[in-house]
């Protein structure tokens, strides 16, 4: 099967808070991240297409990342980032080049 990802991913272990639009925030753990999105390990079920805001601390900087759920399965969800600002882009870029 051919890899569809555009951006390289790095393995991480970052505590996150994920808040679905119109729903309650829940805790999860980001297990991999790229410039395009992240996989969040969680027991919560969030439907495909749900807009979310991910609160995470990267390199000592608190970030709120907008995104959309692109897939969900028992144990986690894949989130594609929305429009990121310069600060968010820089922080993720720094994480990817460690």
What are these regions (language model features)?
Residues 21, 35, 72-77:
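Short, conserved beta-turn/loop elements at beta-strand boundaries and strand-helix junctions
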Residues 14-19, 49-62:
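Short conserved beta-strand and strand-loop elements enriched in small hydrophobics
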